């Protein structure tokens, strides 16, 4: 059967309609059958609605998402002139544009580089060497097809190898931008993996010393290797501040993805940041309390600082583990942290905290927090921690549960 339907200036020719459904009234049309299980037209809206059947099937094909794959080398060197990024985008509608998005470690802004087409489905662009540094980067591709549907690739997170003297403590994002002051114990760490992390035997009589302190037993040992994610106690008696750099070893900047830090011991552990920009630490999607020792300013006061959940490059931190092998998650980008913690960002008016601070001429203790939280319980719970151990002379704030 062939029929012609005329209505307000448009023509629809159909064949083999298995049945018609409903009466035509008020300038409306509804056809039910093999071609369009439901084809309806409402004169008031000047539109056609397709529901199932052949027309709907064809329409569904054009709405299928783009198949998008990207290709970047797993390991990149800062000495390269550029880094080639390639994307293969397969879409029945054709691709209107492809853009490479780049985010440098520690940066909020996203750089966008238009990609050029090699053929109908392959796109390419080069990342300039000016973006290759110890902070590393992550990248992803966004394509738009001819129907303006958008597709987003997975993140590419390469390892970045850097040369000697590229990793420096006197960086603006460092805990010690002016170096470590003299005659004070401070915790230091290296925010990258050194391929040769050997430490020479040190002695304070010779000018400086490194120690690994077991905070459970109180035992002090001299380390012989720098390990990423671990911090060390350091003291020197030179006239000038000490600034560390990787002058004897090339290194690797870790991929910019969630990084796991394993706490070896039950109780207090010493950790450092594996990244050369500030990062946030979580445990079970909740912020972790980290404590560093002393401030690196002219006051030269010693003691435990206020708790934080942010790891700053080159510093070391004490963190408490409820059990050996507990794993912390290091989040490399703030936007990821915001997404993960969106539900926990609401402030409950019944919750409160108070930081108790004690300071003398040469010593301080800012480590104690009291308060009320929905995650807390009456009596001892996971939020309660024993006092941090003391080093040499000190002042301290002490509290007791139910005391």
Question: Whereabouts are the PLM-identified features?
Answer:
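Glycan-association/targeting regions that enable binding to alpha-glucans and other polysaccharides
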Residues: 59-175
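N-terminal exported-region signature
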Residues: 8-60, 162-403
